[in-house]
């Protein structure tokens, strides 16, 4: 219902929405491809740069190198560009459309002016990204036997952050995953299971479903009759497998 309300409101126009989606996709992918090409024109030829930009934004996780993105594990710019594309592609076109609509008014509006759905998706995404990165960093830092993660703390956290973002929606890797501990792999699997936002390029059960499941467990423990998100309740009858599928 939240997704439908956000996308199919009274002023919704399908043609305008599709045009905005196309503009967002082309704009992000072309800009990312240009940055990659200017940064390293040897590896990122025009085709290679565009391929990796599209692969990142569409959360495909495909790379042209046989070892995926391992060669760029110490390249902060490439890591940042790929991460931004993954996040934007996995947050949902409805959320992106709403954020761009606010920014296009010529001033930065407070976060509270976003819809409840957008705030829920953005806040949960940020939490999962940071929490996943911290867990991987703590587990893998200075762990004996993992030569891929030998270096200063900032570099290790950047790799942890990259994989926290990539695992949930895309699948790129900058290190040999065979060297990771079982604890880190479990963190990655949980992030893969959750996935991205509704109406996005990402897979998984989706962020809204994850929040509903967590909220349902918390409500049962507290003895509450309904889940409350941002001062609004979710009726128990909406917590069905059908609802989970649609979300």
Segments from the language model and where they lie:
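Membrane-proximal intracellular helices of multi-pass ion channels
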Residues: 1-247
